[in-house]
Design a protein with these regions (language model features):
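Sec-dependent signal peptide recognition
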Residues: 2-7
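Structural signature of alpha-helical solenoid repeat scaffolds
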Residues: 35-38, 68, 99, 103-106, ...
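Alpha-helix N-cap/helix-start positions at coil->helix boundaries
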Residues: 24-30, 57-58, 95-96, 120-121, ...
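Hydrophobic h-region of N-terminal signal peptides that target proteins for export
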Residues: 9-18
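Cyclophilin-like peptidyl-prolyl cis-trans isomerases
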Residues: 248, 252-256, 263-477
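N-terminal leader/linker segments that initiate helical-solenoid repeat arrays
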Residues: 18-50, 57-64, 68-69
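Alpha-solenoid HEAT/ARM repeat scaffold
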Residues: 27-34, 61, 95-99, 124, ...
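Amphipathic alpha-helical scaffolding segments comprising HEAT/armadillo-like alpha-solenoid repeats
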Residues: 41-53, 71-88, 105-116, 135-158, ...
Length: 477
């Protein structure tokens, strides 16, 4: 397969005049049929064979690439494709190098200094590394107490470069490890705070403290992300002693909480669990949400059945507006504007339709439909990626219909934008932005865009920051 692809591509004319030839309406229609065949995963479609024989190298590449992706889910032959423009190169912020240098969990002197760093991501990293080895360091304990005690009643807003709930949440979990008694004294305030992220972190702190009473309360929280964190912690501490809570959670609508409950119920000795989880599975099947596959799989396993019994709804092949133009290299850009309550600012991404036209056109359509407005960046790992665009602010809640992979030859470099998946062809419309070079991700994840402006805003995003809007913008002249 790889040799055949290479041999075919060697025949592609290199002349610039050939690349610049104006395509006809019929040519564009052929590209559209090729893209539809790729989306259907139909390598027998005549459009692919016709495209592979086309006189224009752009059309031939699109057809050959489609055939390769259909036949090989990993598309190992992608490296034999003609090279594409490289993404922009972005320098690292100096603070990330300091963050990266923090590795020793027992070096209390280094961690104490890092807690006073000028960059909050470095402080968070130091906080998250703290262990009981630093229990005797009064300066560290004082800093953690001050952060928790400074938590405002309304922690929904922050200025650029600052924090709102974040410091107190991280400090609460660290204090549970370093000074459990002092953490217990502050748990009531954290666990009842109006900001759901604070309550979720309180559940993690309660897990460290083995505070099962608090976890039982949080497992009934109105926010599904809080429920998820509490159930995961409670099941670790009490095994099946709290199966009543997990069975009751199965009736909820939050995918993440129901999944956590199903995982907790696996192996339960209760006779009613099989029927309860099977009934919940049937309800989730009726919803027809492809992104809820993980929930359905967990429910099947809790019922003593095989997760492979689940069959997500089929992908509906559709040629969206701009897909053909993107495939042929159209420069389409989106501006991601952050909410003022999340520090404001914006960054611009260029869609890489030359490599992932189906995915890029789907993202463009969702942005035009205002799908992302008001959603958050729910996952922030300051030396890895930011991820967001979930209606439930959770990795298990995504678009109701899967988006297929379009693995290509753009490396996952700093500033590239990829599609979140949990398996082949399971794109859920959640973005992730690479904060550093993550080339190992290229094996499984599609790059569909790249940051072309505002990387400093990307670097400054914190967990829970809100996307105000995503709008199409014209390229700069």
């Amino acid at each position: 397969m790889r040799l055949a692809l290479l041999a075919t591509l060697i025949l592609l004319p290199a002349a610039a005049s050939a690349q610049a030839r104006q395509l006809t309406t019929a040519d564009s229609a052929l590209v559209g049929r090729i893209l539809l065949a790729e989306d259907r995963r139909d390598s027998s479609d005549a459009a692919i064979a016709e495209g592979a024989r086309h006189s224009d190298p752009r059309v031939r590449t699109i057809a050959i690439r489609a055939r390769g992706r259909i036949r090989d889910s990993r598309f190992a032959a992608r490296d034999s494709l003609p090279p594409v423009p490289a993404p922009p190169t972005w320098p690292e912020p100096s603070w990330r190098l300091r963050l990266r240098a923090l590795t020793a969990k027992s070096d209390c002197n280094v961690l104490r200094i890092a807690l006073a760093d000028s960059a909050w991501p470095v402080r968070f990293r130091a906080t998250d590394l703290l262990t009981p080895a630093c229990a005797g360091d009064d300066a560290i304990a004082t800093t953690l107490r001050e952060w928790v005690d400074a938590l405002p009643a309304d922690a929904s807003r922050r200025r650029a470069g600052g924090v709102s709930w974040h410091a107190a949440a991280h400090a609460g979990v660290a204090l549970a490890r370093v000074r459990p008694t002092e953490a217990l004294q502050r748990m009531s305030r954290l666990a009842s705070h109006r900001q759901p992220q604070v309550r979720a972190y309180a559940a993690r702190a309660a897990t460290v403290l083995s505070d099962t009473l608090r976890l039982r309360t949080l497992a009934r929280d109105p926010d599904d992300n809080v429920k998820e964190a509490a159930i995961e912690g409670l099941s670790k501490l009490t095994a099946h002693a709290d199966d009543d809570i997990y069975v009751a959670t199965l009736n909820g609508r939050g995918a993440q909480a129901v999944r956590a409950a199903a995982v907790a119920l696996k192996g339960s000795p209760r006779a009613d669990v099989r029927a309860a989880t099977s009934s919940a599975y049937a309800r989730w099947v009726v919803l027809g949400n492809a992104s809820a596959h993980d929930v359905r799989a967990a429910l099947l396993e809790a019922a003593g059945r095989l997760a492979t019994e689940d069959r997500p709804p089929p992908v509906h092949a559709e040629l969206l507006p701009q897909a053909v133009a993107l495939a042929l290299g159209a420069d389409i850009r989106l501006r991601v504007t952050m909410a003022p309550a999340s520090g404001g600012g914006s960054f611009v991404v260029r869609l890489r339709g030359d490599v992932a036209p189906l995915m890029a056109s789907r993202i463009l359509a969702l942005a035009r439909a205002r799908y992302y407005d008001g959603l958050t960046w729910q996952r922030v790992e300051h030396d890895f990626v930011i991820q967001g665009g979930s209606p439930g602010a959770n990795e298990y809640v995504g678009l109701s219909e899967f988006i297929r992979d379009e693995l290509g030859n753009i490396p996952h470099l700093r500033g590239t934008v990829g599609m979140s998946t949990r398996g082949h062809d399971t794109g859920d419309a959640q973005w992730f932005v690479n904060l550093r070079d993550n080339q190992r991700l290229g094996r499984d994840y599609t790059v569909f865009a790249e940051v072309v402006d505002g990387i400093d805003v990307v670097d400054g995003i914190l967990e829970g920051d809100i996307i105000a809007s995503i709008d199409e913008v014209l390229p700069r002249p």
